[in-house]
Swiss-Prot record:
A Pfam family it matches: GIY-YIG
InterPro entries the record matches: GIY-YIG_endonuc (IPR000305), GIY-YIG_endonuc_sf (IPR035901), UPF0213_domain (IPR050190), UPF0213_GIY-YIG_endonuc (IPR022992)
Taxonomy, superkingdom: Bacteria
Protein name (record): UPF0213 protein Spro_0507
Signal peptide start and end residues: none
PROSITE patterns: GIY_YIG
Length: 102
């Protein structure tokens, strides 16, 4: 029997200060609600209203973790470009991994 693995997503949240937070999850809506309720990352607690700025499918957990690492290495300008002009694919960040934005 084949086990169905969940699809992971990379997401970016914008804080009122303009800062972008990057994370991964299997359910973007659920994770955003957790963050807004103060039950997510400590870095976001008490930061005010969070807005989903970007999200994309990232494949399995391993690929999602690698993509998250690469996005966190981007400069603020590069992250803002990613948010304002979402590419059709994030393959350029992980040449060995196919990732669809959406």
């Amino acid at each position: 029997m084949t086990e169905i693995l969940p699809t992971w997503h990379l997401y970016m949240l914008r804080m009122p200060s303009g800062m972008l937070y990057t994370g991964i999850t299997t359910d973007v809506t659920r994770r955003l609600a957790q963050h807004q309720a103060g039950k997510g990352a400590k870095a976001l607690r008490g930061k005010g209203q969070l807005v989903l700025a970007f999200h994309c499918q990232a494949g399995d957990r391993s690929k999602a973790l690698r993509l998250e690492y690469r996005v966190k290495q981007l400069s603020k300008t590069q992250k803002e470009r990613l948010v304002s002009h979402p590419p059709l694919s994030l393959d350029y960040l992980l040449p060995d991994v196919a990732v669809k934005a959406g």
